[in-house]
């Protein structure tokens, strides 16, 4: 009986010893600050001069201008994604490689899609404006997705392909419609003359992607086929209702009954 008691006590002792040792390690490790890296120096809190100075010191100490973070982004990528023109300009002068893509397949131009002034900076250094990310979206797609008319105009004027499609067959007009920027939509339809009734791989034209009645009304005014069915036989008002756009769905359904 004493032997069993001794064994049980020993097991309990070993268990608590391991438990306390494990927790002690966790507490010690939790108190060790993460080692700062150069990417931490590019943020939306510090001033621009300090960021440039920190990168300059980093490079003077043998740092790699094309180092990437866990997401595959370079220093240039992080700079442009935050809209820092002067910082991006400085990094470019340090012979940064603009051909690198991150884990999502995005390059610096794609990450600049919402900043036309940075796009303008990059245009002199980029030959191919139509590099696409893992979803098949070029910088022009992203600019349309942001609803940034100035970026879209600049990219198209510079030669971006307006006829490309993403991996789902979606067009730039569909992304513009999703952005809800009516001026952008008008520009693509009236000035660029994109085909308003083009369909994606699901057989859906741009009205399937509308979220506002004002956008749908304009598309209908420009003769979009709002009665078309997609590849599984659903009409736009049915898809929109499923997606929670009840007012727009009701608006289109009433038009169907006229």
Label for each model-derived stretch:
Residues 1-24:
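Classical Sec-dependent N-terminal signal peptides that target proteins to the secretory pathway
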Residues 21-61, 70-73, 81, 106:
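Intrinsically disordered, low-complexity regulatory segments in ankyrin-centric signaling systems
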Residues 44-50, 78-84, 111-116, 142-148, ...:
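Ankyrin repeat A-helix N-terminal signature
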Residues 56-63, 89-97, 121-128, 153-161, ...:
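Ankyrin repeat domain, specifically the short helix-to-loop turn at the C-terminus of the second helix
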Residues 194-234:
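Ankyrin-repeat and related helical/solenoid repeat scaffolds used for protein-protein interactions
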Residues 225-257:
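Leucine-rich solenoid repeat scaffolds
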